[in-house]
A protein has these predicted regions:
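Extreme N-terminal leader/targeting segments of oxidoreductases
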Residues: 1-15, 33, 462
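Conserved N-terminal/central alpha/beta ligand/cofactor-binding core
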Residues: 2-6, 37, 43-158, 162-164, ...
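C-terminal structured subdomain/cap of oxidoreductase catalytic cores
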Residues: 9-10, 29, 322, 398-462
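N-terminal Rossmann-like FAD-binding beta1-loop-alpha1 element of flavoenzymes
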Residues: 15-40
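A conserved short coil-to-beta-strand element within the FAD-binding core of flavoproteins
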Residues: 161-175
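A glycine-rich dinucleotide-binding beta-alpha-beta segment and adjacent secondary-structure elements
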Residues: 167, 350-433
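Glycine-rich loop(s) and the adjacent beta-strand/alpha-helix scaffold that form part
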Residues: 184-255, 443-452, 456
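An anion/pyrophosphate-binding glycine-rich loop and adjacent beta-alpha core
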Residues: 233-346, 350
Length: 462
């Protein structure tokens, strides 16, 4: 952090947005429509971020997309689902800010910027009480970024890739004045800006911060974007900003190993199970894929096997990542459980016992000892399929505390003039624990808070 009351940049703009993922691009669209001259600085050679690595699913209630599909949902119910999952540990005002604004943001992106959304209504994601996962037609995060990038280009918003922001500039009275960017060749650029929006996500790629705040995942596979180096947290500490829930994160218990491909949790929600190398189940797969990362990593060899059938394989093929896993030969099939166990190199007897147990539970529509409900319509039938998986860290959920206009708050309760945060740079809605993550919380805060931050620029700064 540099202090320079006389700072003058090579470039002068109204709003510098650090990060070119869903949060940053949404903020850029909103800020530009507010009349701001915007620069998006992206450290990589193309726009991507954690969004491009995700499935691109955005939860929202009472949207136009839901109405078109005759899905009756409410923001009140969505709010309750989030709070129940995080055990009421997140700030309800912050959660409400996200729930209210994600509806506005998605309807706006669709109506004003031509981004086509539909709602996935084949299955419910863990702990959601309604169909509310919105996606673009391709159902990938990369496609979502592409739509946002095209919208940004249509507004002639300036995007500068290969520009890594390495320092912020503030005045002696604490106002943000600009930043210093660095190019791959080592050259630097000074940027004067009335406002800065931090859209640089969290710190999943910073091993020191992970060891400090999430030690249980310091040796896990990191499945997020390598550029998530925690600048928001580092700069926030230097600015004496309020920071919370740094122990919170999204994990995932279903990453094909060693292929490194995400395998959709829809397979578990619609009847699949996970077993360890001993052929035994070890948890309630319906609690959530985030906390399942820890459960899988606690198993022998830190691996598990997803077991499913032809019906679920067809469901999986609706997702590009699953199709990639098939092409990579990560998916194993067999006509019998005995053959499947042999192919997986796990004990035949215990796996057969497990399958008999879950079949009996399904036949009786019963609840198992882990608390999972089984039902007869989702009984697994031959041929059987399996994929070897491990647990992974996806992205962190703690960050800078902001107000309802996305302004960063200091420990003394005042605002850092000119500084805003959204997405993973801001504290999320999942609370301080891995189990608090509700499916889609990442893109929920990225797009809703990006929208809030961009819209706030005109009202406060310009």
């Amino acid at each position: 952090m540099l202090i320079n009351d006389n700072f003058s940049g090579d470039t002068e703009i109204d709003c510098l947005i650090i990060g070119g993922g869903a949060a940053g691009l949404t903020a850029a669209l909103a800020a530009s429509e507010s009349g701001a001259a915007v620069l998006v600085a992206e450290r990589e050679n193309r726009l991507s971020g954690s969004t491009a690595l995700s499935s691109g699913l955005i939860p929202a209630a009472e949207t136009n997309a839901q109405k078109r599909q005759d899905i009756s949902d409410s923001k009140k119910t969505f709010f309750a689902d989030i709070m129940e999952k995080n055990c009421n540990s997140a700030d309800p005002n912050h959660v409400n800010l996200c729930v209210e604004n994600i509806t506005l943001a998605l309807d706006w992106l669709e109506a004003e910027h031509g981004i086509p959304f539909h709602v996935l209504d084949d299955f419910l994601y863990p702990n959601h009480t309604n169909f509310r996962m919105h996606a673009v037609p391709e159902v990938t995060g990369e496609a979502l970024v592409n739509y946002l990038e095209r919208a940004v280009a249509e507004l002639d918003i300036y995007v500068s890739c290969n520009l890594k922001i390495v320092n912020l500039i503030k005045s002696s009275n604490g106002r943000i004045l600009g930043a210093i960017g660095e190019r791959p060749d080592g050259s630097t650029e000074a940027i004067s800006s009335k406002t800065i929006i931090l859209a640089c996500n969290g710190y999943g790629g910073n091993s020191a911060l992970i060891a400090e705040n999430i030690p249980e995942m310091q040796n896990a596979i990191y499945f997020g974007h390598a550029g998530n180096q925690g600048e928001a947290v580092i700069w926030g500490r230097q600015l004496d900003a309020k920071i919370d829930h740094l122990s919170g994160y999204q994990g995932h218990g279903s990453v094909a190993h060693p292929h490194g491909i995400l395998v959709t949790w829809a397979l578990m929600m619609e009847g699949g199970i996970q077993v360890n190398t001993n052929g035994k189940r070890f948890s309630n797969e319906h609690k959530g894929y985030s906390e399942q990362a820890v459960n899988v990593l606690s198993q022998p060899e830190k691996i598990a096997f997803n077991i499913f059938d032809e019906r679920l394989c067809a469901l999986g093929r609706k997702f590009e990542d699953f199709r990639k896993a098939e092409k990579a030969n990560a998916i194993i099939s067999a006509d019998t459980i005995e053959d499947l166990a042999s192919k997986l190199n796990i004990s035949i007897g215990p796996l057969c016992e497990t399958m008999l147990e879950i079949d009996a539970l399904a036949e009786q529509n019963a609840v198992d000892t882990f608390g999972r409900n089984f039902n007869s319509k989702n009984r697994l039938q031959p041929p059987y399929y399996a994929v070897k998986v491990t647990g992974a860290l996806f992205h962190t959920q703690g960050g800078l505390l902001i107000d309802n206009q996305a302004r960063v708050i200091q420990k003394n309760g005042s605002f850092i003039q000119g500084l805003y945060a959204c997405g993973g740079a801001a504290c999320g809605v999942s609370g301080p624990d891995v189990a608090g993550y509700l499916s889609g919380n990442g893109l929920l805060t990225a797009i809703s808070l990006g929208y809030v931050a961009g819209k706030s620029i005109k009202a406060i700064e310009l």
